[in-house]
């Protein structure tokens, strides 16, 4: 039987077209492929680190920066892999106690390489905890930001001297922009925060006036607090996508999405459209609450885009959410729909990252859940096509089981030639556990793929059908019994 490591290796080989990474996204008109190999991360990645960012440097190393619960310093860690950041040593980059720049909160640091220098943007309280404004550090003297010499460039001056935070920078068609959240005296009597955008004249100065690209004007953005914050810009498939977070920093915290054409005038507010509904929200089934303040990076093999965000593992918080330290850094693969738009899915459960099973017979189809039935599906919500590979499986050594991501505790189960989704986590019935188990072998029609023999029905394999057709187990040896993992 093939090991999980071998299956992931085969899956990587089977990808015919490499997905252009976010790091490559500045190239004009990137091509689109919705296919990319699976990733093998384990959540939670870093405990008690909020507002996370992971940057993959050109040397292949990953750098991690985030808000610490004490809100008093900027720390950084590095590793050769995303998973390696989980246990990497942290290094102090800047401490409020060693500076005269401010006395208040230190929030949401971000690391960026601009030219041959490093920059860290974060919110710093000037004269009081909540008197926050965007602040900039410049790192020089080393291609490694952990070894750079850091100097304070100061606060960024915006159009209004009001509460402002979460500065981020991105480049589109050779023009560098800054986006940030700020209380706008022209909206909600100066309450809440809107998202602003401006061109930059240098890494610590914007060209004024700025524009507003989003206000908290939807009901889901106004729960607890009227908030748009934590933006992140990326260019893909001829579009500029800006993710952001909304509402109070409890279980109501969620993510929205702004979109503009890459060649549009980004300084024209009319160029931007907003998602009607949030694109990433709390999920009780997976026990992840308040997901948000996202950033994006690329996988270790450079073939998948990776969503970086924070969430809590419980819903109810005692006291002020800001005083709660349990926002955890998490990572998961970002998928792309055939129309070129991102599908964020749901916050996946703790533990190993799930996979998708793409049919070798029709590579637009996936094993998925539709109307509580296991079917071959096309363009389904990504969470309905994700399964965690449990190894050893419920049937014991030498087997694996497929646990639904959207419905944890439910597994693919084969009986009498059909496949269903069954609740089996706590069952001691050996027959039921065997029915929910498979043996993994090299792809029957393509050795770079993988096939799954039923542990309960020897010689019968998991088989895909046409779009909307039931997934079954049968003694097939063709492409319909071979899958590629994503």
Swiss-Prot record:
InterPro entries: AbfB_ABD, AbfB_ABD_sf, Glyco_hydro_43, Glyco_hydro_beta-prop_sf. It comes from the Eukaryota. GO terms for cellular component: extracellular region. The keyword Magnesium does not apply. Transmembrane segments: none annotated. Glycans are attached at residues 42, 302, 416, 426. Organized into two domains: an N-terminal catalytic domain and a C-terminal arabinose-binding domain (ABD). This is Alpha-L-arabinofuranosidase B. It comes from Pyricularia oryzae (strain 70-15 / ATCC MYA-4617 / FGSC 8958) (Rice blast fungus).
């Amino acid at each position: 039987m093939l090991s999980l490591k071998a299956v992931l290796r085969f899956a990587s080989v089977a990808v015919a077209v490499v997905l252009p990474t976010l790091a490559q996204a500045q190239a004009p008109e990137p091509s689109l492929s919705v296919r990319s190999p699976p990733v093998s991360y384990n959540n939670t990645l870093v405990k008690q680190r909020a507002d996370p960012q992971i940057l993959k440097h050109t040397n292949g190393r990953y750098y991690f920066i985030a808000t610490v619960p004490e809100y008093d310093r900027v720390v950084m860690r590095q590793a050769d892999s995303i998973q390696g950041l989980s246990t990497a040593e942290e290094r102090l980059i800047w401490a409020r106690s060693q500076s005269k720049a401010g006395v208040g909160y230190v929030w949401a640091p971000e690391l960026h390489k601009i030219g041959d220098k490093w920059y860290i943007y974060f919110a710093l309280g000037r004269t009081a905890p909540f008197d926050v404004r965007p602040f900039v550090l410049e790192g020089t003297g080393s291609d490694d930001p952990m070894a750079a010499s850091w100097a304070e460039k100061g606060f960024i001056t915006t159009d209004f001297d009001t509460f402002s935070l979460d500065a981020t920078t991105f480049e589109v068609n050779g023009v560098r922009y800054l986006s940030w959240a700020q209380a706008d005296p022209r909206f909600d009597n100066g309450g809440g925060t809107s998202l602003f955008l401006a061109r930059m004249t240098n890494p610590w100065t914007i060209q004024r006036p700025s524009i507003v690209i989003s206000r908290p004007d939807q009901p889901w953005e106004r729960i607890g607090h009227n908030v748009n914050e934590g933006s992140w810009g990326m260019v893909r498939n001829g579009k500029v996508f800006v993710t952001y977070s909304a509402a109070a920093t409890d279980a109501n915290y969620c993510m929205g999405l702004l979109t503009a054409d890459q060649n549009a005038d980004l300084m024209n507010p009319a160029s931007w459209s907003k998602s009607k509904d949030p694109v990433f929200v709390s999920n009780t089934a997976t026990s992840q609450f308040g997901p948000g303040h996202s950033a994006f990076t690329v996988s270790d093999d450079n073939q998948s885009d990776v969503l970086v965000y924070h969430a809590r593992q419980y819903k109810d918080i005692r006291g002020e959410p800001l005083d709660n330290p349990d926002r955890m850094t998490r990572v998961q693969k970002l998928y792309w729909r055939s129309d070129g738009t991102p599908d964020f899915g749901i916050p996946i459960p703790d533990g190993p990252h799930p996979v998708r099973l793409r049919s070798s017979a029709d590579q637009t189809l996936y094993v998925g859940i539709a109307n509580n039935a296991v079917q071959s599906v096309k363009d389904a919500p990504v969470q309905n096509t994700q399964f965690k590979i449990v190894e050893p499986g419920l049937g014991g050594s030498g087997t694996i089981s497929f646990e639904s991501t959207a419905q944890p505790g439910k597994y693919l189960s084969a009986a009498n030639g059909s496949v269903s989704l069954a609740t089996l986590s706590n069952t001691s019935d050996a027959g039921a556990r065997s029915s929910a188990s498979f043996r993994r072998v090299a792809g029957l029609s393509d050795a770079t793929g993988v096939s799954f023999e039923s542990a309960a029905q020897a010689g019968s394999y998991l088989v895909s059908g046409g779009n909307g057709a039931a997934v079954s187990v049968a003694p097939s040896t063709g492409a319909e019994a071979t899958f590629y993992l994503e």
